[in-house]
Amino acid sequence: MWKTWLQGGARVIFDDYKPYLRLDPQNGDLLLNEQLDREALCDLTEPCILHFQVLFENPLQFFRAELLVKDINDHTPTFLNNHMLLKISEGATLGTLFQIDSAQDLDVGKNGVQNYTISPNPHFHLKLRDSDEGRKYPELVLDQSLDREKVSEFSLTLTAVDGGSPPRSGTTLINVVVLDISDNAPEFEKPVYEVLVPESSPLDSLIIKASATDLDAGINGELSYSFSHVSRDVRKTFEIHPISGEVYLKAPLDFEIIQSYIINIQAIEGGSLSGKSSILVRVVDVNDNPPEIAMTSLTSPIPENSSPEMVVAVFSIRDQDAGDNGRTVCSIQDNLPFVLKPTFKNFYALVTEHPLDREVRNEYNITITVTDLGTPRLKTEHNITVLVSDVNDNAPIFTQTSYTLFVRENNSPALHIGSVSATDRDSGTNAQVTYSLLPPQDPHLPLTSLVSINADNGHLFALRSLDYEALQEFGFRVGAADHGSPALSSEVLVRVLVLDANDNSPFVLYPLQNGSAPCTELVPRAAEPGYLVTKVVAVDGDSGQNAWLSYQLLKATEPGLFGVWAHNGEGRTARLLSERDAAKHRLVVLVKDNGEPPRSATATLHVLLVEGFSQPYLPLTEAAPSQAQADSLTVYLVVALASVSSLFLFSVFLFVAVRLCRRSRAASMGRCSVPECPFPGHLVDVSGTGTLSQSYQYEVCLTGGSGANEFKFLKPVIPNLLSRDSEMEKAPPF
């Protein structure tokens, strides 16, 4: 368990935030960062204990511990002055005590001053006393009466010895001056003075005036005030006026360091008698220290999918003031997904309140505010920035729900035909998107030979030239996958529409332009203007406007005699025919599409003007709409063969009849074609759904050598005028 905690992160935190120790992450040993100086850390306080906490970050655990710093005898006792002057009245009684300065030793306990000795002499011996602070101080005891007339002055050597091993010692010289007799010793008003001093008191402030009285007169009644056996802290913080006994503040007070001082004072009169008193100075706390924030650990960035109550930061709060001045309140801003939780003593943990979402907010600037309860209130703010790291929790999203791309046929290979684009709300590698073509749902679609995709940017390219007439459109799916772990992906449908290009010229279906014997259209000379001679039938493999065909008479043997309708290709007579018109005519019809640029084809027509012929009447049963609309090639071929045979015989009879009766012209609405040379018969546009007018729902082609002896012509039929019960009539044979 300890190893697990160590791997999760551990640190040592002292109350004064100084890194005296560190924790070995391998074995958990506490190691010194630097050499410790007990005197600097604790001064005269004994025992010297440093309080610290061991913080384990994951999981969050606190352990309180103490470090005891043991003293070693590394300091020698020293006296404040190298020599002392002691004035003693020759009338001093035996056993009188005389105060002398004590030595100071920075060590404590047995390593501190343990004993004093004085050089051998017949007049004095030393007596040791314990002060209120636990230190030993010496006093001279008068063993033999002094006689100023015999000895007016002599010197003694005072030695201070500590209890270390080996012991250390320090010395000072005492000069004793014998004075005339003095009867009364000075006396202070109080044996102990007590005073409260705010720690914010300015320097040179009067702390207290301690006064003593002496009943003697003259020089024996003159008093001199001084400190007696005081610590170094007292001497550097306070001073006493030697004449008035006023105590002044010499250095700033700090309640957080020292809360009280004991000042031993003495009043010495001219006759060397002295009086003693003590001053207890209590330092009053003032709210002069703002709270302190020490950041112990900070985890940033944190994953966006972190569980609630994940520890983001651990910090401690300290206010060196006391009472309400040292009580604190800690807070952060509202509307943040974090909360503060007190953990141990003055430690707080900043934890997540609920899962974070980096895509909503990827950075939080948190201000930790600590306010004390003093008057006036002091506060401290500490700003931290918590970054939210990305987790791959968002799949790529395409910018469109589907894509439709247009590419014109006959494109060059590797043509850029469009792009797909997907975005990922994640960041870093989690947001890097790779595109790919997914297997098509139609197994027969050769997708890999049609298009390719750039995996990095989603650009789509046509791998080969597309042909609209072979493939008008196709669809496929594109996948977008990020680089997260695990990777997330999405897909989108892409439709590619092939746009038609005008790459096909019109193709003439009728009359055939294949180099065979041309068809000749027979037109009676009695035909009225607008008589339907023939109809050019053409198709275009393109679509749209590229397949919109228009017809134009390009050449004619006799201009103005025939015309071609631009929209349906019908060739009609433009005026009445006359005897002067040539019998044979050659027409060249231009068929042009509406593409850009337009493409065209030509059809050559041969027209033969004949003198006229009677119109056979075909029974209506053979011209019923249901029969006319049947698109059976076999049936019409049989009819055509029979008609060709009959037409041959009819032509012979017609030639005789024309000669006999030139003036009698029989109007005929039918048409036939006579070949100039043997050719196979053709049946064109007999269906009601064709491009011919509904008034001419028949076409008969004759072949040479037919054995039939009669033929029939259909009358013009208008389907919407025929009734179901129409009777059928047969044309009488010639």
UniProtKB/Swiss-Prot annotation:
CDD domains: Cadherin_repeat. It is a single-pass membrane protein. The keyword Lipid metabolism does not apply. Pfam families: Cadherin (PF00028), Cadherin_2 (PF08266), Cadherin_C_2 (PF16492). SUPFAM superfamilies: Cadherin-like. Glycans are attached at residues 115, 365, 383, 514. SMART domains: CA. The chain crosses the membrane at residues 638-658. GO terms for molecular function: calcium ion binding. One of its GO terms (cellular component) is plasma membrane. Keywords: Calcium, Cell adhesion, Cell membrane, Glycoprotein, Membrane, Repeat, Transmembrane, Transmembrane helix. InterPro entries: Cadherin-like_dom, Cadherin-like_sf, Cadherin_C, Cadherin_CS, Cadherin_N, Protocadherin/Cadherin-CA. Residues 1-79, 80-188, 189-293, 294-398, 399-508, 515-621 form the Cadherin domain. GO terms for biological process: cell adhesion; homophilic cell adhesion via plasma membrane adhesion molecules; nervous system development. It is found in: Cell membrane. PANTHER family: CADHERIN-87A, PROTOCADHERIN BETA-18-RELATED. Potential calcium-dependent cell-adhesion protein. This is Putative protocadherin beta-18. It comes from Homo sapiens (Human). The gene is PCDHB18P.
